[in-house]
């Protein structure tokens, strides 16, 4: 059968991986797809590298706009990244009636609503398995595998850099700054790591999963985002003593009031499978009302793991590209006319449990004052450690886990506790999820 | 849009779950599928229970053959189980041009080749996500999510009963017989547990995954099957001391010589995520050449988890049922004309590592004799425990882990070791997989 022709935009890490996996496994992929999938043209600014990688097996150009207008191209694979030129290219490809496969989470999180509307109007597919959690087929699981369910929540370790850093901080008892340098040396963190360590990358991915899970429009601009750069190794240790592990989770949850959409360091019980996802690995835990909890685990980044997702999309599009649009899986899992506009909840309205660490003067009555304030806000305490002060030390630390409460209540309590004479310095507040 | 009409065969546990999840989440499912999915007729021998469960919302009958011939039925859902009447019904439904959704692993493992050929000829779909690992969308992951990959191997905990029993044996230090009775009391094991505890159920599921992974025809009749009924609690303890956990794994692996297809108790390193899958949960670890290892975890049985998979298939079939067959995902992942016939390897040719436990007379020279025999077969030792004999005891135990070797070599060595004067009783031999 006639091969399908792919125009590849960008042959960096993921583009290079896609090119080489297609070459290596092309025969087996064709046996699955029903026809060969071939890269017919590659656009990249670095023509010399592009020629070296493609070895005359296809055309090369430095003009990406020529590729999205090329009449011989059936599917455009956008692996340039960023959300300016990439957006123009994707919209132009759609306008030209091309199907698009992309790994660009920033683009979809910010401009997905516009892009999917354009694709819908033109009757083309925009596939994006590679945009979330690399090679793990989590988009497929959410959009197709769990269609029977009312999805209740999703909690994911969806940034390998931060998970690597947290694993190392715990294992070796080192500080964030020291481990970040090590991660940069090993290539697990970028020279400018802000995007990863401050949780922005995770929030992009979370926004995409949230839209698909709830049939809601993409709401990245309303996500609450906290990273791990302020996390103290002492809190990782105390959490362990209490039976918890700290992970940077992306959490989205449907409540009767709206949708929670938040990325922040989170205590989770050590006995949960997801608490044991170590190093640069990714995992997504999904709670559906019928299936219960399911978990998806694998490499969330890297050339070939991400290429695995790009090519899975290519096979899907190859199978479906001549079919009526009605036969295809909707871009955001729900039919375009069946999307809803659920409000994203402000963090003050989120209900969860909390870990608090207070530095206090070592004298009687302090604990009574603190617990009185918590009780006034109807916050009850689940567990507590009071560190024994060392010989001659006049201050000590109290660590508490609370039961569930609304974030505005804990914040009100913290303000009052911080104003107590006996309380010294800032109060550490981390969120805790049981994930049951 | 016009609803799609489902004929449900069997309204027991899974049928009842399917009926009630469709009722509860029908509106949300229609928003995904693009049209309502409604059960229009249910066939079950127990008419009274059927009427009670369906509450006049659809027709009921005790004649399943009438349903598969019913012109108003678009999709037949077969949840009767077994492989005699169910086979006739499925083949009849296909002959009548109906699409089929089934959870029947025994039927597909034994008669899948015939059923898929009939469906292919007639241009209908046979969907079977629910046949493997309950609500975990593992069939979709293998058939669609990982299409870029040359799949190297799959290792799965795909029987909840046995995983529950092994978890309890380890946690509580109890024997198989005691825990089995407890599992039966809790409803985790059938009154006749043979099918589960002897590994047959796991082998059915493994055969289906193996065919999909490698594009091979269904080869259940050649699977090697060992259960857990002979497993001694002592070996679970020794394995723990050595850093391993014992799980009943279904393993299928592509080698240059053929396909390994085997179910047996297996030692796996405790630090692997899959080693920490406890109780009745299921998990499948898949190694692809591009994506690396990915893991899928969730409930492998039960009314609603299995219904989740049945209904996901119903949504897929609903979307695709008027599309050209060429647009659909092939039944066994590879196009029918691109299937191969890889040989299934006899166990003697399988290469893996081993755990050995020997009861020996407590005297010098025994260990030298044993290691000499292993060396003669080119088997090297990775770790060893020699239990200190108690005061006055004349026998002791030696536990060894070997490096990889061919099964015929270890068996030859065991025969020679067993004939040594100093070796008392049977030698325990378990297989060990690193799963990397």
Segments the model singles out, each with a brief description of its role:
Chain A
Residues 99-101, 381:
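A short hydrophobic/small-residue beta-strand
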Residues 178-276, 281-283, 302:
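Substrate-binding/catalytic subdomain of NAD(P)-dependent oxidoreductase enzymes
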Residues 309, 314, 318-436:
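A conserved regulatory-domain signal marking ACT and ACT-like small-molecule sensing domains
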Residues 85-96, 105-143:
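Rossmann-fold NAD(P)-binding glycine/threonine-rich loop
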Residues 1-96:
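N-terminal glycine-/serine-/threonine-rich beta1-alpha1-beta2 phosphate-ribose binding loop
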Residues 120-201, 208:
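Rossmann-like NAD(P)H-binding beta-loop-alpha module
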Residues 264-289, 303-304, 375-393:
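Low-complexity, glycine/alanine/valine/leucine- and proline-rich hydrophobic stretches
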Residues 45-47, 65, 105-107, 113, ...:
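Short, ordered loop/turn segments at secondary-structure junctions
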